[in-house]
Structure formats: C-alpha cells, structure tokens
Design a protein with these regions (language model features):
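N-terminal structured subdomain of primase-like DNA metabolism proteins
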Residues: 1-91
Length: 91
C-alpha cells in the first residue's frame, strides 16, 4: 500500500475499523467520542469531504496521518503510515 493509497482512505473508515462510530452525523460532518482519550460528550469532529479531523477537547487536528500519530503515539511519518496500513489491512 503506497502513501497516496493511504492518503485516500477515509478517516471515518479507520475510526470504524478501530471500533469508533459517529455519535452524530450532519452532511459532511461527523462527531465522535474521542478515540484518543476518555470523554462522555463527543468533541471529536471529522469533516468527511475535506478528510480532516479536530479534537476540540485537546485542540489537536489534521489529516489521517496526524490521527494515526495521535492514536499510536508516534511522530514518525512512516510509523504512522504503517499503523494505518495495518488497521486497514494493507501492507
């Protein structure tokens, strides 16, 4: 699986494969309980059209790679790419 293929994976697909489903949807907007920390009120936002996320509880956000870094606690781009490929089932 190359970087462009990984970049094309929808964030919501990775979240689903990790066991996280949206609490609320409205058009291109999805709200989740944060996959990175415990919370009771959904503050984790995904814009499905733009392919970006923002956690209003922490102020962090970005693309699928930064999300992989948050979840896997990795700053390295290749480690993030491997994490995504592993979750998605690619090699």
């Amino acid at each position: 699986m190359d970087i462009e293929m990984i970049r094309g994976i929808p964030i919501e697909e990775i979240l689903s494969r990790l066991g996280h489903e949206p609490v609320r949807r409205h058009g291109d907007e999805c709200w989740y309980l944060s996959p990175c920390r415990e919370e009771r009120t959904p503050s984790f936002h995904v814009n499905t059209r733009k392919g970006v996320w923002h956690d209003f509880g922490t102020g962090h956000g970005g693309d699928i790679f930064t999300l992989a870094g948050e979840i896997s606690e990795s700053d390295g781009f290749m480690a993030q790419a491997r994490f995504i490929a592993g979750v998605y089932g690619g090699t």
